[in-house]
């Protein structure tokens, strides 16, 4: 990241560790090893597993609109532990209420050094607590009129299913998140900075996540 306000990690096998997993690692470390408490603020496109971990520790997870300015405002005005967004911007209350990728990397290194465990081992321990999951995203470039048509269909709840995946509920904090089953969901949202329609998904495995994204893409482009 050009100005180092975001963080990305790779494990020992060279596999990318996304921001959703980094946020979970930071929450666990700050609570269990640093004794820090407070609310966790995350953007609408972050994994819902964050709430599961917060529930485990008896702390609150508040979901904000997408954009770190919304998270920053909440962290300043309320007692906070951490704020994070899907794009890798994370802040912790023991530092400043603003994104700092270098600081987050140092905290993760400290976590690994103190426990003597690898990233994979630490992530597996979190999976043992809240269940495994995978997140992914498609960025679909399309004409503006097609993008607006899809968003209008979301507004009027036209999408009842995406292929074999039946919609059981909808959340509309910032975009349209369609709840599926077993902690799975898919979210449709126009980019605020590029001529794109972003489609996010969460499921138990990477393969299932891609299957949901493919089914959603086929449905909205039909």
Regions found by a protein language model. Give the residues of each.
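Short beta-strand segments
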Residues: 1-2, 189
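Short, glycine/acidic-enriched loop or turn micro-motifs at the edges of active sites
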Residues: 2-6, 88
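Short, acidic/small-residue loops that bind anionic groups at enzyme active sites
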Residues: 16-37, 65-67
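Short Gly/Thr/Asp-enriched flexible loops that form oxyanion-binding sites at enzyme active sites
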Residues: 5-25, 50-51
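Phosphate-binding and adjacent anionic-ligand microenvironments
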Residues: 12-13, 36-202, 206-222
